[in-house]
From Swiss-Prot:
One of its GO terms (cellular component) is plasma membrane. This is Negative regulatory protein YxlD. Induction: Expression is sigma Y-dependent. Induced upon nitrogen starvation. The gene is yxlD. It comes from Bacillus subtilis (strain 168). The chain crosses the membrane at residues 5-25, 37-57.
Length: 68
């Protein structure tokens, strides 16, 4: 592996790990299957984050009456 490939791989791993941690913590705060969202967030990026927004955050905001 070249140095560039190693840097890209490490950066991708950090992005996916940060996404998984964020999804787990936020889903736990909203009581929405925290473990499932955390594991799904570790699989790939950015689709789980986009799905989480449309399936959890957006309905939760509508439920609470918070406008974006």
């Amino acid at each position: 592996m070249t140095q560039t490939e190693i840097i890209i791989t490490v950066a991708a791993c950090l992005i996916v790990l940060a996404q998984g941690i964020f999804l787990f913590i936020d889903a736990k705060k909203r009581n929405h299957m925290a473990w499932v969202w955390g594991i799904v967030g570790l699989i790939q990026a950015p689709m789980p984050l986009i799905c989480y927004y449309f399936f959890v955050i957006r309905p939760d905001r509508k439920k609470r009456g918070i406008k974006q």
